[in-house]
């Protein structure tokens, strides 16, 4: 398993309130339980958000997730940048991903 660098951006669509995070928790077919995110080094927020249908997104880094006690693991998904954020409770995840911003990928349409 490849370790994602701390400086990698982590992007998740939606309001990212604790109740939204709670509803989004699931177990990936690989066995990792957490929430789906887009994550990569060297891509812009807009590039990572391009596969996200929501009008708003939350943004953090892998390093911030790890400082809070969680991790981001590369998992298969709809895009090549899909990953699973795991190891944090919904409140902790929400604090990292709020306030949200407008999805720049949707603004370019």
Place the predicted regions along the sequence by residue:
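Conserved NAD+-utilizing ADP-ribose enzyme module
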Residues: 1-8, 16-109
């Amino acid at each position: 398993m490849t370790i994602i660098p701390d400086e990698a951006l982590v992007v998740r669509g939606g309001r990212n309130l604790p109740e939204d995070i709670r509803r989004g928790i699931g177990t990936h077919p690989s066995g990792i339980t957490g929430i789906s995110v887009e994550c990569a080094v060297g891509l812009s927020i807009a590039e990572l958000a391009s596969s996200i249908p929501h009008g708003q997104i939350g943004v953090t880094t892998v390093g911030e997730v790890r400082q809070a006690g969680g991790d981001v693991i590369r998992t298969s998904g709809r895009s090549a940048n899909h990953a699973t954020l795991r190891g944090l409770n919904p409140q902790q995840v929400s604090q990292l991903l709020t306030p949200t911003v407008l999805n720049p990928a949707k603004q370019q349409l």
